[in-house]
A protein has these predicted regions:
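Glycoside hydrolase catalytic-domain groove-lining segments
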Residues: 177-229, 244-247, 287
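Short, solvent-exposed turn/loop segments enriched in Gly/Ser/Thr/Pro and often Arg
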Residues: 37-44, 78-88, 137-142, 173-176, ...
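Aromatic- and acidic-residue-enriched segments that line the glycan-binding/catalytic groove
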Residues: 51-59, 70, 81-108, 112, ...
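Carbohydrate-binding surfaces of carbohydrate-active enzymes
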Residues: 99, 110-140, 146-158, 164-166, ...
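Aromatic-lined substrate-binding rim segments of carbohydrate-active enzymes
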Residues: 22-88, 94, 156-162
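N-terminal small/glycine-rich loop or linker at the start of catalytic domains
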Residues: 1-13, 218-228
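Short, well-ordered coil/turn segments that N-cap beta-strands
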Residues: 4-8, 33-35, 69-75, 130-137, ...
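Short, acidic/polar
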Residues: 15-31, 240-248
Length: 316
């Protein structure tokens, strides 16, 4: 929109929230001074059966995006095709298993199904792009690939651009793509008491990708216990004040935006959860699984108010 923005984003998943509660959760984000919604799209949520796409009811992606726009949020859209998200097969439909596909690769059989899926969701996304008067300003391909395969990532970029997606393309946790036309951002999760660990990631990003904005596609809230082992919160809990310190450290390190993961976790209904993941996806997030405002919400709101007040200075 021609103005510099500090991206203060929160991740919410329509596939973990009943449609009747979508607007309530989005309004709570807006009231905490968030300006952006981070949103995965789960392929298998829409193509549970091969070739039969469903975008109705709780799967109404267009309505989800429209509600975010209605409450005044920009949108950071993340269609994968792989999303992880502790979701069944990371979003891949299970009918891909007998297809003898090499997932997350340029293997032709996989790419055939991948292109069909992306074509479908991009038709919904395209009218909502900021270049078309909507609110989607950033589009992520893949997710936490970590170890390269630049041609695969560039092919995904080519596919979505062919579909008319003309906003910046990014990915996360794959430093190998730095130096290409894809914006790369780390996920500076805290796995110890040292907030300097996350700050080091951002400072390295600024140094190695100086021509692109230093953005973190995910910063963790409490996460889930087994991600952290025994250091130092084996029960999965950590003080909200540690997240506050981490956010302030990232801002001081020069970050231009971040996406809370999760801002509202919701619920893994039915059998959609990944292996070893509970039905609850609460995450001890700012907005609790049942919609109550947790301690992190008020921390986020204080920081959000600060970011909004000094956005121009912080976005230089």
């Amino acid at each position: 929109n021609g103005k510099r923005k500090f991206i203060n984003s929160g991740e919410l998943h329509y596939f973990r929230i009943p449609r009747s509660q979508w607007k309530d959760r989005l309004l709570k984000c807006k009231r905490a001074f968030l300006n952006t919604l981070g949103a995965y799209i789960a392929w298998n949520w829409h193509e549970e059966k091969e070739g039969k796409f469903n975008f109705e009811g709780d799967r109404d992606l267009d309505k989800w995006i429209s509600l975010a726009e209605e409450v005044g949020l920009f949108i950071f859209i993340r269609p994968g095709p792989y999303i992880c998200s502790e979701w069944d097969m990371g979003g891949f439909p299970n009918w891909l298993i007998p297809k003898d596909c090499e997932l997350r690769s340029l293997e032709p059989n996989f790419m055939k199904y991948c292109i069909r899926y992306l074509d479908k969701v991009n038709k919904i996304i395209k009218p909502h792009l900021i270049t078309k008067g909507g609110k989607i300003f950033l589009y992520q391909v893949e997710n936490e690939f970590e170890v390269g395969d630049i041609p695969y990532h560039l092919k995904l970029k080519e596919i979505v651009e062919k579909d008319g997606i003309d906003v910046p393309i990014c990915t996360n946790e794959n430093a190998w793509v730095r130096g290409t036309d894809i914006i790369e951002g780390p996920d500076p999760y805290l796995r110890s008491w040292l907030i300097s660990d996350a700050m080091i990631k951002i400072k390295d990003l600024i140094k190695t990708q100086p021509d692109k904005p230093p953005f973190a596609p995910e910063i963790g809230t409490c996460m889930i216990g087994w991600f952290y082992g025994q250091l130092p919160f084996s029960d999965g809990y950590r003080p909200p004040e540690l997240d506050e310190a981490n956010l302030k450290g990232l801002i001081a390190a020069g970050i231009s935006g971040f996406n809370w993961y999760m801002y509202h976790g919701g619920t893994n209904i039915g059998y959609w959860t990944a292996r070893n993941i509970a039905t609850s996806y609460d995450f001890d997030a700012p907005i609790k699984e049942w919609g109550e405002l947790g301690k992190r919400y008020y921390i986020s709101r204080r920081i959000g108010g600060f970011l909004e007040s000094f956005e121009e200075e912080l976005s230089e």
